[in-house]
């Protein structure tokens, strides 16, 4: 029996946290003290709207993956600030109370827990200028190997000290 089938019934639940984070892979180094004590499904930047986390191709799905599978989730959101920004992300394992787990990254992620949101599309023929962002994750260089709750933390790479 392969790992894919052995873990197929252990769900992984995600919430979106638009918060700042530590991101060593892309030259951004922030203190762990900046992370919230408890992750919440909140938006901290007034320009961010229409946040959706779902299974690709299924608009009303829950943000749940099977541990050990190569399934992905799709994150979409709009930035109404009018400027294209560079966003990064980090994935954290959380306990049942959505507090950051004490486990080291290597025990719950194989590969890199950080990345960059590369897909951005400018609006056209609209009253307001905005950019739509899209991320499919986990990416090729990341595999979630532990079942549990995960927080997807999004931050602005240009100004990582400000909450997005």
What is the predicted function of each stretch?
Residues 1-31:
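Bacterial Sec-dependent N-terminal signal peptides
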Residues 23-47, 51:
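Sec-dependent signal peptide cleavage junction
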Residues 43-93:
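Contiguous beta-strand segments within globular domains
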Residues 83-112:
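Extended low-complexity, serine/threonine- and proline-enriched intrinsically disordered segments
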Residues 109-131:
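Extended, solvent-exposed segments with strong compositional bias
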Residues 129-155:
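Ligand-binding face of N-terminal immunoglobulin V-set domains in extracellular IgSF glycoproteins
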